[in-house]
Design a protein with these regions (language model features):
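Alpha-helical recognition/docking segments in bacterial nutrient-uptake
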Residues: 1-6, 60-172, 176, 234-236
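N-terminal helix-turn-helix DNA-binding module of bacterial transcription factors
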Residues: 1-62, 351
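Short beta-strand segments enriched in small/hydrophobic residues
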Residues: 13, 18-23, 57-73, 173, ...
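Hinge/beta->alpha junction and helix N-cap segments in small-molecule ligand-binding domains
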Residues: 69-79, 97-106, 149, 159-169, ...
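Short helix-capping segments at alpha-helix termini
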Residues: 90-91, 140, 205-212, 236-240, ...
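Short acidic capping loops at alpha-helix termini that bridge into adjacent secondary structure
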Residues: 180-181, 212-216, 265-272
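Flexible loop/turn connectors
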Residues: 232-351
Length: 351
């Protein structure tokens, strides 16, 4: 097996100094195009591979970022990761991805494992343990950024859409359409993001002087099955809702199926609203009214924040908590309609 070529040997073959080779392989603009091309050609011909361990000893950075997600199959998470990876690639960072499977304990263990490795920072997307007093979500030397959640600790950073405001706006939209029996299907594993959306829902009802009915609130889970079962519970009530706010678009999609299984129609018989504006939401029949979350932008901004936190100028300096909140946009579509006499009769008669 051929021994890997060293920078020193490349320098000898290219008739340049060792520092020149190092700069050329990093595409330093101080190195001329012809010299850089010659050095890179020699390196490629001899199968040069950079010694990442040696580089990290010099730079005190590994150029690896840990990323913990609840479910890699979740379209929301996929969009966020695409934004993260775009910025990471621009700065020559690699991502170590781990899936918690929606288990808060497993998520915390994953963060612990990443923190104990020689990585530069950790991103936690749709954090399940974000509200828990875990020591790994407190004062860490390695920065942690939560996406779609936040933590009460002083040194855990976060980036979110305006969850409270978004839920309040979409509930106000339903109120403006005349609805008063408005249900909420939440995510019992949603952490702070679910709490904020639930508070927004309640705030809108209070502002409109509409009585809060606890039986209209279902704590399900963010999944098709969770939305289906949550909606079925609401439809089984003697006094049914005429409209429902869902934690996210996946939950709303499950609610669609439950409504149709009951022989009813979305919008005509019951209005449904989501949160996220996933790629399929505008293609549903009827198209889904929802809050647009700029998911890719959230990933980009989270990665930029993490890069700022790991920059040499910030090393060994305690940084106060950074909380970035991005406004969402109400997308009014076909799944919500004005309260009709048909709605009113069904709400008070049940199935």
């Amino acid at each position: 097996m051929r021994k890997p070529i060293s920078l020193k040997e490349i320098a000898r073959l290219a008739h340049v100094s060792h520092p020149t080779v190092s700069r050329a392989l990093k595409n330093n603009p101080l190195i001329s195009q012809s010299t850089g091309d010659r050095i890179r050609r020699i390196a490629a011909e001899h199968g040069y591979q950079p010694n990442l361990n040696a580089r990290s000893l010099v730079t005190q950075r590994s150029n690896f970022i840990g990323c913990v997600v609840t479910d890699i199959a979740d379209p929301f998470i996929g969009e966020v990761i695409s934004g993260v990876e775009q910025v990471a690639a621009q700065h020559e960072y690699s991502i170590i991805l781990t899936n918690s499977g929606g288990d808060p304990d497993r998520e915390t263990r994953a963060v612990r494992s990443l923190v104990e490795r020689a990585i530069d920072g950790v991103l936690v997307i749709a954090a399940m343990a974000g509200g828990a007093p875990s020591p790994y979500f407190s004062e860490r030397e390695i920065p942690i950024v939560l996406i779609n959640n936040h933590h009460p600790g002083n040194f855990v950073h976060s980036i979110n859409v305006a969850n409270f405001d978004g839920a309040q706006r979409i509930t106000h939209h339903l109120l403006d359409l005349g609805h008063r029996q408005i249900g909420y299907i939440g995510n019992r594993f949603g952490g702070q993001s679910d709490q904020d959306r639930y508070r927004g829902y309640r705030a809108a009802l209070k502002k409109a002087r509409v009585r809060y009915a606890s039986e209209l609130v279902i704590h399900a889970e963010s999944s098709l099955e969770g939305g289906y079962r949550g909606m079925k519970q609401l439809l089984d009530l003697r006094t049914q809702p005429t409209a429902v706010v869902c934690y996210d678009d996946i939950t709303a999609l499950g609610a669609y199926k439950s409504i149709r299984t009951a022989g009813l129609q979305v919008s005509r018989d019951i209005s449904v609203a989501g949160f996220d504006d996933l790629f399929f939401s505008s293609y549903l029949e009827p198209s889904l009214t929802t809050i647009n979350q700029p998911m890719r932008e959230m990933g980009e901004q989270a990665m930029k924040l993490l890069l700022d936190l790991v920059a040499p100028s910030r090393k060994n300096k305690k940084s106060t908590k950074t909380q970035i909140v991005i406004p969402g946009q109400l997308m009014v579509r076909e799944s919500t309609s004005a309260l009709s006499s048909r709605h009113s009769r069904r709400a008070f008669q049940g199935l």
